[in-house]
Design a protein with these regions (language model features):
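PLP-dependent amino-acid enzyme catalytic core
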Residues: 1-144
Length: 144
């Protein structure tokens, strides 16, 4: 196989829309630039908005678990690829309330934002510019 970056395709799972992911170099390095090694352990799935929405609805209606759009892609891939008698897990990195407008529209509901998340969302973003040099990063960490 040959890695060929593609233009991003916008979906409601916006972090999954990257056509040329910056972290792909890490995957290549981890697997020694071997396509065979990568495909022996990694499979991929892609979903359009309607499918992502369906996974959110199915999961919520079947067990009351509310997925965010990215988790819905992981859940869908697990359901699509899991073989009979296999057990699998999927992980989510965000609370569905981070995508409240999207989830509300999918479920035709008004989901609640947990108090702790509400407080966090009211906080001020703090960023400190650093160079790409490890020594500068280390110096900053040692200073705090």
């Amino acid at each position: 196989g040959k890695y060929e970056p593609k233009p991003s395709v916008q979906t409601i799972a916006n972090a999954m829309d990257v056509g040329d992911p910056s972290n792909f170099a890490r995957v290549l390095d981890l697997y020694g630039h071997s396509h065979a090694a990568i495909t022996a352990e990694i499979e991929g799935c892609s979903y359009v908005d309607e499918e992502i929405s369906d996974w959110v609805k199915k999961c919520f209606s079947s067990n009351g678990y509310l997925l965010d759009p990215h988790g819905a892609c992981g859940f869908g891939a697990l359901k699509d690829l899991l073989k009979e008698n296999e057990i699998g897990i999927f992980l989510e990195t965000a609370h569905p309330a981070k995508f409240k407008d999207t989830i509300d529209r999918i479920l035709d509901a008004d989901i609640e934002i947990p108090e702790k998340l509400q407080a966090f969302m009211k906080g001020e973003k703090l960023s400190i510019p650093l160079s790409a040099e490890f020594s500068d990063f280390k110096q900053f960490l040692m200073s705090i």
